[in-house]
């Protein structure tokens, strides 16, 4: 009988190599899982990458609630009163259900982080422990660079459970978004905007780290370009008059709803500037400001003040209007400064 010792040695060596590789992979996976869950329960420190994953998932969950309410034709519409422009400010079950889904998901996932929402609800169901790992894994397709750990006390999360509620009630669904913004030491650095009806797309950007792939097809600037201003439907007339003074007839004004929608229009190059001439709430603009800044644009008040006061103790209202651009920001500021 002949024994092929060389073949056995080769087989055993191959088996040993496979075993070692599998053990290494198992070890790396266990470290990752341990790191992930330790960050999830660590109230003192938080991973910005995990926060991005959580914001992404929260925006999607809110969108599912918004769509569910829309599909129920019997939902009720209440009113918060009127805006300064005299426009009714409605609120619906979609606002509240989206708030519950988004707020409790983020609060449970990141217990040491302050979460500020536009809405409050008295009847939110208790939330279970969120599983962010699958969402975090989906971000592997994006080059977000290195992770960053920050003090949880330095982080404020701003959420808008349903932007453009009035248009939601009017079935103008293209304007509707759910939004999450992550501010560190008062500065918006991560923004997530989800469109629950318009192709169900989710847009995000993280300053100095990366952005969602749906921002990769932004057209390059073509000169010369006339100013294309996107403005709120509720006070388009005022901006129209001011714009005529600032630019004469060499301007195009596009009325739209939802601060999130308008910020995305600027980021996509469909508008050269987003102008808002009255006070605006921070949950309306935080995500859009973070995205535009991360993509290389600029967002300030109409008096040029930067977006740096998004901490837990700051006012929820931005005064002195809003200007968002991808380029020529100072030129637009100068045009509107004295109007």
Predicted region positions:
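Residue-level signal for inorganic ion chemistry
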Residues: 62, 66, 95, 106, ...
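N-terminal subdomain of lithium-sensitive/metallo-dependent phosphomonoesterases centered on the IMPase/IPPase/PAP
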Residues: 2-162, 242, 337
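Acidic beta-strand-loop-alpha-helix segment within the catalytic core
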Residues: 28-30, 179-264, 270, 314-339
């Amino acid at each position: 009988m002949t024994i092929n010792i060389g073949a056995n040695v080769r087989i055993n060596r191959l088996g040993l190599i496979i075993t070692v590789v599998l053990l290494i992979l198992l070890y790396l996976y266990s470290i990752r899982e341990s790191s992930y869950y330790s960050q999830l329960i660590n109230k003192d420190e938080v991973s910005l990458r995990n926060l991005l994953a959580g914001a992404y998932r929260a925006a999607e969950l809110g969108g599912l609630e918004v769509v569910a309410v829309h599909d129920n034709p019997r939902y009720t519409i209440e009113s918060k009163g009127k805006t300064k422009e005299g426009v009714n400010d409605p609120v619906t079950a979609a606002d509240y259900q989206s708030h519950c889904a988004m707020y409790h998901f983020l609060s449970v996932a990141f217990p040491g982080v302050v979460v500020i929402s536009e809405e409050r609800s008295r009847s939110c169901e208790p939330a279970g422990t969120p599983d962010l790992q699958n969402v975090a894994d989906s971000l592997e397709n994006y080059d977000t660079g290195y992770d960053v750990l920050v003090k949880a006390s330095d982080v404020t999360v701003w959420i808008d459970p349903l932007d453009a509620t009035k248009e939601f009630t009017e079935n103008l669904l293209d304007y509707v978004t759910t939004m999450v913004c992550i501010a560190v030491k008062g500065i918006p650095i991560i923004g997530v905007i989800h469109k629950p009806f318009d192709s169900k797309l989710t847009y995000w950007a993280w300053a100095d780290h990366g952005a969602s792939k749906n921002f990769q097809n932004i057209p390059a600037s073509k000169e010369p370009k006339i100013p294309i201003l996107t403005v709120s439907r509720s006070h388009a007339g005022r901006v129209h008059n001011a714009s005529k003074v600032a630019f004469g007839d060499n301007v195009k004004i596009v009325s739209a709803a939802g601060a999130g929608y308008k910020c995305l229009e600027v980021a996509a190059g469909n508008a050269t500037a987003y102008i808002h001439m009255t006070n605006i709430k921070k949950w309306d603009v935080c995500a859009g400001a973070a995205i535009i800044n991360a993509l290389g644009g600029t967002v300030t008040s109409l008096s040029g003040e930067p977006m740096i006061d998004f901490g837990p103790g700051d006012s929820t209202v931005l005064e002195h209007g809003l200007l968002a651009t991808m380029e020529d920001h100072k030129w637009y500021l100068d045009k509107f400064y004295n109007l």
